[in-house]
Swiss-Prot record:
Family in the record: Belongs to the bombesin/neuromedin-B/ranatensin family.
Protein name, as recorded: Gastrin-releasing peptide
InterPro entries associated with the record: Bombesin
GO cellular component, one term: secretory granule lumen
Organism annotation: Scyliorhinus canicula (Small-spotted catshark)
Pfam families xref list: Bombesin
Lineage: Eukaryota, Metazoa, Chordata, Craniata, Vertebrata
Main location: secreted
Gene assigned in the entry: grp
Length: 25
């Protein structure tokens, strides 16, 4: 679970679906 990334990505990908894209990048 990429919980560690939830600290930065939600700012740009708070939707979750887009967050997945940010996690890949």
């Amino acid at each position: 679970a990429p919980v560690e990334n939830q600290g930065s990505f939600p700012k740009m990908f708070p939707r979750g679906s887009h967050w997945a894209v940010g996690h890949l990048m």
